[in-house]
């Protein structure tokens, strides 16, 4: 599953602008708010707080953990646009009101701005992270 082309293009433009000037121009910030709505500003706050961690195992499997504003850690999968937070389940999956939640948007913005924390874990640690998420849900 992919984001709409306009969203993909906006994230590409943000990445290019940030690489050149180390900031995101106002027009792209407005575009972010237009496309992603109310989750744009909170997502930028998460990026500013360096709340996004890229977790990588030796086999190359990657997931992201985002420390939410509530202090809870959410697991995000950028490859399939999925987050374990309740807002994702409700606004994105059930109601189709949003493209994604603030946590996944923060992951994409952190990637674009090179603002991800990095964490190398063993395969066993990665498995434990994934299993812990399943227990939280069930």
Describe these PLM feature segments.
Residues 1-138:
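Long, low-complexity, compositionally biased intrinsically disordered regions
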């Amino acid at each position: 599953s992919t984001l709409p082309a306009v969203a993909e293009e906006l994230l590409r433009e943000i990445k290019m602008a940030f690489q050149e000037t180390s900031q995101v121009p106002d027009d792209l910030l407005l575009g972010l708010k237009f496309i992603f709505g109310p989750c744009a500003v909170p997502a930028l706050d998460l990026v500013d707080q360096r709340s996004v961690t890229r977790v990588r195992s030796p086999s190359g499997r990657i997931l992201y953990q985002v420390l939410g504003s509530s202090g809870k850690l959410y697991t995000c999968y950028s490859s399939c646009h999925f987050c374990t937070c309740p807002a994702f389940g409700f606004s994105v999956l059930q109601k189709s009101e949003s493209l994604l939640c603030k946590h996944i948007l923060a992951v994409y913005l952190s990637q674009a701005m090179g603002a991800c924390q990095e964490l190398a874990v063993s395969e066993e640690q990665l498995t434990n992270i994934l299993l812990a998420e399943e227990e939280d849900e069930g």
